[in-house]
Design a protein with these regions (language model features):
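Conserved phosphate-binding elements of NTP-dependent enzyme cores
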Residues: 1-930
Length: 930
């Protein structure tokens, strides 16, 4: 086997016939500016070939489920192992998928609870046990040798028989005696007396003396089995002459309740055996939404936390509840957020003293009254106002049957564990003490669980809980979870290709991520990472830089070699090398912009926020920082953005919990959240249509003499509408043929040969270029072309795309092929191109995603251009290059999850760097130092 992966003549996308060698079993980073060809080399060449070879080695039956990848365009690739790609995508859209199921930790927890879980009665709190013959023998052996005892079985009359018939049947089976009314009697004597209808009669199975000999123990086991059989799973031991009795039951019951025996299916919310019957294992139902009924949890019942009980008429329900609350010591002056779960249940479902009442004051009864009055319009409106997707009232969001809650390990149920942040869960397992038998049975399972929890901690996800939905994770979080799953599977001899695993990761956790990648390498794998993070580049064994620029100006290998040897490459045309050597830097601003106007959020307590007060300056660049899970998104996306939207009279989701918003709100006319979601709702949308440049291009072609002569309007030059587009492929340029045993074949359309338009439309040209030629130009090429021919309107609309570093993408590039970071920058370009004069707050969520140092420099220039026009920039960011250039920093923390949500530091970057409690400040200090 070759000691390196050798790629010869790669020509995928913009790669210029490059030759690359990647040492096997190393940690390699592929770097370069956006659009230089990194992903073309890593994913479209390396991964495509590794996956293709692996899939083609399988049977045709297996291939139909896997699909097949096309062979990448290159001369050859040698020494490539099976490839696994871990991308920044939220792969699971399944509403049942959680962090626990994705990492397989939950599967091991289910098995652990099924194997060593102990069931406890919710009534007495005593452990529920199912006895066996072994328990009977153990009890007998606690007595001294020679002690006499009797094995008894309670008599259960079979259906259709009388007690007399049952006893006669026992006589025929060879049984002689019974125990009734504290006395032993012969069955025939008892039958002769004629008093058979007694309440409780026991059948004597055997009379024995305590002895530890094998024969006696074997006889005892046989007798116990017979007693369990005849007694319907129940039996007794009576020791003589004291008549001390011990009861045994093979039934799993206690306190009059029959319990379900623990099994892995009992703890599965994907199985009917374990799923909550009300919500079918989803944890949520359509019903009355608690957050809408009680939006402000800092208020008490007395202060009016239940908003549907406001108003002259509805207030009677509040007063009714308060009158009854004293009987059960309900704390009417306690804020709702401080009530116990039991007290909340009383408010929602009824007080214990009203248990048997036909009418009772509680929220459930109130809404039953509203539902019964739906024929009145005001009640229909009220019901609609408070209805939403809410937590299941039966399982309280745990998704499991109540029976699962009774099974515990170390005093905790499986529901308790999945609601703990991973960091606390790992500590709990480290402290868990088990008896010798449970330790032996659960040893392997505990090892797997602890290892996987440690992997999650190592990649900075200690703030997540195992019941967190997979589809609510960011792309970076999803990728790191998949990385943990890969480590847990312990594959060896594979090629792992990762796409920017550092996305969304604060500087503190980058070191941990590097260790995880090294662990993956140490297992015997080759790790290739497409990355822009400086620390990860410096930690790599091997560095490949693709460039020097983007698009047609990229696609070359401008540096390759040991990452430690870059000092010998001074004066390189590689931007990566120049930034790593300090030959080029992003300068710290000489001064910070002053500000007077601001918006204040009071008492923010959504998710883990601790009722904090935060000031957001206007007309400057503010960055919200903090470790993952510290509350940044809750503060900005969950509270500030929807609050401002509502204040401006725009429709949006309800903001999270907070006390109020104040300040210079009227100084803003608009608020825009620039996220990484795809541009446009149609897969046919492209950057040119989004920035409105394509409208001007279509107008230009419609003005040409041939168009005038043929009657072609601008609509004819659109591939989205009938008229000028090719009707065979509907303007797609390709025809997709479904293949069962292979991947779908995408063929060039035979009618238009991939040009998307009819021939007579393609005959219309502007300066020797038809509409298809223009759509295939990169942004940079199009600007150059239209500037040369003085089409200033088109140039002006395209220039903003160039300004944000997207000059390498094509005008007609399908929006579905753009990354999240590219989508975000297209939206930024749109706002820059608009030249909006009304003061606007622009909110960005990690805009440096996918950006090289050189691209960040361009991005900062775009931000400064918006601020110069009187707008405000607010950014959620981890990248120190952006943070050091901010005018104001808001640092949340100090950690993630329940250890976050506090305002750790605020002020200029220099002020935050001086704060000893701020982790951001610690790393910022190094960036600000000369």
């Amino acid at each position: 086997m070759s000691d390196s992966i050798e790629i010869k003549g790669a020509r995928v996308n913009n790669l210029k016939n490059i030759n690359v060698k990647i040492p096997r079993n190393t940690f390699t980073v592929i770097a370069g500016v956006s659009g230089s060809g990194k992903s073309s080399l890593a994913f479209d060449t390396l991964y495509a070939e590794g996956q293709r070879r692996y899939v083609e080695s399988l049977s045709s039956y297996a291939r139909q489920f896997l699909g097949r990848m096309n062979k990448p365009e290159c001369d050859y690739i040698r020494g490539i192992p099976p490839a696994i790609a871990i991308e920044q995508k939220v792969i699971s859209r399944n509403p049942r998928s959680t962090v626990g199921t994705t990492t397989e930790i939950y599967e091991y927890l289910r098995l652990l609870y099924a194997r060593i879980g102990h069931t406890f009665s919710p009534i007495s709190g005593c452990e529920v046990k199912k006895h066996s013959t072994e328990d009977v023998v153990k009890q007998v052996m606690t007595y001294s040798k020679g002690t006499k005892f009797v094995v008894l079985a309670p008599i259960h009359v079979s259906e259709g028989r009388t007690m007399e018939q049952q006893l006669k049947a026992y006589l025929l089976e060879g049984f002689v005696r019974i125990f009734v009314k504290g006395d032993f009697q012969r069955i025939d004597d008892f039958l002769a007396a004629g008093d058979c209808e007694q309440e409780e009669i026991f059948l004597v199975i055997d009379r024995m003396s305590v002895d530890d000999s094998k024969d006696v123990i074997a006889r005892l086991v046989d007798s116990a089995e017979t007693a369990f059989y005849e007694g319907g799973g129940e039996m007794q031991l009576m020791f003589l002459p004291s008549n001390i009795t011990y009861s045994f039951s093979m039934r799993f019951e206690a306190d009059g309740m029959t319990f379900e025996e623990p099994s892995d299916q009992l703890f599965s919310f994907n199985s009917p055996a374990g799923a909550c019957p009300t919500c079918q294992g989803f944890g949520r139902i359509i019903g009355i939404d608690e957050k809408l009924v009680i939006p402000n949890t800092t208020l008490s019942v007395y202060d009016g936390c239940v908003v549907c009980w406001h108003g002259e008429k509805m207030k009677e329900w509040q007063q009714w509840f308060i009158r009854h609350a004293a009987i059960d010591d309900f704390p009417i002056f306690e804020p709702y957020m401080n009530l116990t779960q039991q007290q909340k249940d009383w408010l929602w479902h009824g007080l214990p003293s009203d248990k048997d009442a036909t009418e009772k004051p509680c929220i459930d009864e109130f809404f039953k009254m509203v539902e019964a009055s739906q024929y009145k319009i005001q009640y229909r409106v009220m019901l609609a106002r408070y209805r939403g997707r809410t937590t299941c009232p039966t399982c309280h969001g745990t998704r499991l049957k109540p029976e699962a809650e009774y099974v515990k390990i170390g005093g905790r149920s499986i529901n308790d564990l999945v609601q703990m942040p991973v960091v606390r869960l790992k500590e709990w397992f480290d402290r868990l003490e088990l008896n010798e038998q449970d330790q032996e049975v659960g040893k392997r399972l505990l090892t797997e669980i602890k290892n996987r929890l440690q992997f999650l901690l190592n990649v900075g996800l200690g703030y997540l809980t195992l019941n967190r939905l997979s589809n609510s994770l960011s792309g970076g979080e999803s990728q790191r979870i998949n990385l943990c799953t890969s480590l847990g599977s312990s594959l060896v001899g594979s090629l792992y290709i990762l796409d920017e695993p550092s996305i969304g990761l604060p500087a503190r956790d980058t070191d941990r991520l590097i260790h995880v990648l090294k662990d993956l390498q140490d297992l015997g794998n080759t790790v290739v990472v497409v990355e822009h993070d400086e620390e990860i580049m410096r930690a790599a064994d091997y560095l490949i830089d693709i460039g020097p620029d983007a698009g047609r100006l990229g696609g070359e290998v401008v540096f390759h070699g040991n990452a430690k040897d870059i000092t010998s490459s001074k004066g390189s045309k590689s931007y990566t090398v120049r930034y790593l050597l300090g030959e080029e830097t992003i300068e710290v601003p000489k001064s910070r912009r002053p500000w007077n106007l601001h918006i204040d959020i009071k008492g923010a307590r959504m998710n883990n926020l601790r009722g904090i007060d935060v000031e957001f300056p206007l007309n400057v660049m503010t960055v919200v920082t903090g470790v993952s899970g510290s509350g940044k998104s809750s503060l900005v996306k969950g509270i500030l953005y929807p609050s401002l939207k509502r204040h401006l009279g725009e429709v949006c989701d309800a903001p999270g919990e907070y006390l109020g918003i104040s300040g210079d709100i009227n100084a803003l006319k608009h608020v825009e959240f620039v996220d990484q979601n795809p541009i446009g709702k149609s897969t046919r949308s492209n950057p040119a249509t989004y920035v409105k440049a394509y409208d001007a291009i279509r107008d230009l072609f419609a003005e040409q003499p041939l168009s005038q002569q043929m009657g072609f309007t601008p609509q004819y030059f659109s591939f989205n509408t009938d008229g000028g587009r090719c009707e065979e492929c509907k303007g797609a340029g390709v025809i997709t043929v479904e293949m069962q045993f292979m991947a779908d074949i995408v063929l060039e359309c035979e009618a238009c040969h991939g040009h998307r338009f009819k021939h007579d439309i393609l005959d219309v040209k502007f300066k020797e270029k038809n509409i298809d030629d223009v759509l295939n130009m990169t942004i940079s090429e199009a600007i150059e072309f239209f500037r040369k021919h003085r089409q200033d309107t088109i140039v002006k609309r395209l220039q903003s795309l160039e300004d944000v570093g997207l000059g390498y993408i094509k005008l007609g590039q399908n929006s579905s092929t753009l990354s999240g970071g590219e989508n975000q920058r297209v939206k930024l370009a749109y706002f820059i191109g608009q030249e909006k004069q009304e003061p606007t707050l622009f909110i960005f969520d990690e805009p440096t995603t996918g950006l090289h140092f050189h691209d960040i420099h361009k991005l900062l220039e775009a931000f400064n251009a918006l601020i110069a026009r009187g707008h405000t920039i607010l950014i959620i960011e981890h990248n120190m290059e952006i943070i050091k250039c901010a005018d104001y920093v808001i640092d949340l923390g100090p950690d993630g999850g329940d250890k976050g949500g506090a305002l750790v530091a605020k002020g200029t970057p220099e002020e935050v760097a001086r704060c000893p409690e701020s982790l951001t400040g610690k790393y910022l200090k190094a960036k600000l130092s000369p």
